[in-house]
Amino acid sequence: MKSFLIQVSGIVQGVGFRPFVYNLAIKHNIKGWVNNDDRGVNILLNCKEQEAQNFIKELQENPPVLAKINSINIEKITEIKECKSFEIKQSSNSNNKSTIISPDMSICNDCIEDINDMSNFRYNYSLTNCTNCGPRYSIIKTVPYDRVNTSMSSFMLCENCAKEYNNPTNRRYHAQPVSCEVCGPNVTLYNKYNEILESNINAVEKAADLINKGFILAIKGMGGFHLVCDASNDKVVNQLRINKNRPNKPYAVMFKDINSIKTYTKINLKEEETLCSKEKPIVLVKKKDDFSLSKLIAPNINQIGCFIAYTPLHHLLFRYLKNPILATSANLKDEPIIRSKDEVLNKLSLVVDYILDFNRDILNACDDSVIQIVENCNIKLRNARGYAPTSLKLEKTTNKKILALGANQKSTISLAFENNLILSPHIGDLNSIESVEYFERTIETFKRFYDFEPDIIVCDKHP
């Protein structure tokens, strides 16, 4: 019997990696432990060398859906550390932060089933998630990715949620945003005067009814608010353009599912694959010749930005909606996407009629990603929700910590340290005080994530 210490780096926190390791060890009858630290995941195995090799092979070939393994370091320990079983230990702190933050991900099929299953205690719950889906980047304060370090820290688990959270064989084991209507954040519908109209599923149903009747709503998404209205209603789409002072720029449309998109557009297999991916980005596709949604959504062009409902709240909303919805980032011109109801009321009270909110704070804003398929390849026009933060491995190791800032337009920041390159989500044009503040806040956020103080700062020379 030997002992092996395995260090795994990459997107390995908040993606069900520890329970995956636990169940893999149980399957192979291996004793030891697994834990998180601020570099990634550590695994100790008590087993024969061939058993360790088989374990690592399966770890590499079949990791959790949302995981991305960048490196595996294996060390044979001469002093054997005997373990009586395999356990999941508490997170530790190494003072060397390099773990990769997972992007937010769209709701998985299992959670969609949960919110539509009348026998499930999460039936109709708009903030359902598990280790395979839901918010990550948008709710995290710092690493390691534990509940105490997220905007869910103030919500204490009820008995039902705690059972799942503490069961290593459950897909919600240590899913940090896990909650239900009893113990978690809830959805509330407000009018523009900040008066509460409805809560929970009644709020969702009423919001859908208001959209069907031609009103404009601000609806909280994963990384910020959307401005939403009926995509088939010329009058309300035109009113939104007037309210936002956006006469011609195309809007995106959110659909219930891929079949709904096919009703209005001509999509190829690659576009369908991207639309249905776990990231659920906006994809630019060709309109059908008899395109029957409002011509004011994307005037004078033959393409439209489409995306599929990606949160449980969206899916519940489409239960009651009659048509696809126009969904665009809630912001003023040249300002970042809005994260809070109070900011919507302060800045967009003349734009929206109602607000559908929930009380899980968005700590880090993140727009929708935008993709165009060119020669069967995904070209990212906006790298954001689902894809960012983006981690890349450098071919060479840098001995300097480098912060790259880009230029004034379409701004994004990146950090380079060791052999890691971390790209932030899309920030946007830096033409307002608010966008510059967002830019500076993003820099401070990423510095905090990685205990990063740059040795070198670089930017584009042009303005």
What does each model-identified segment do?
Residues L217-A218, D451-H462:
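Short glycine-rich phosphate-binding loop at a beta-alpha junction
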Residues T397-N420:
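Gly/Thr-rich phosphate-binding beta-strand-loop-beta motif of the actin/hexokinase/Hsp70
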Residues K76, G224-K287:
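A phosphate-binding glycine/aspartate-rich beta-alpha loop in the early core of alpha/beta enzymes
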Residues L227, I282-L284, D368-Q372, S411-A416:
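Short beta-strand scaffold segments in enzyme catalytic cores
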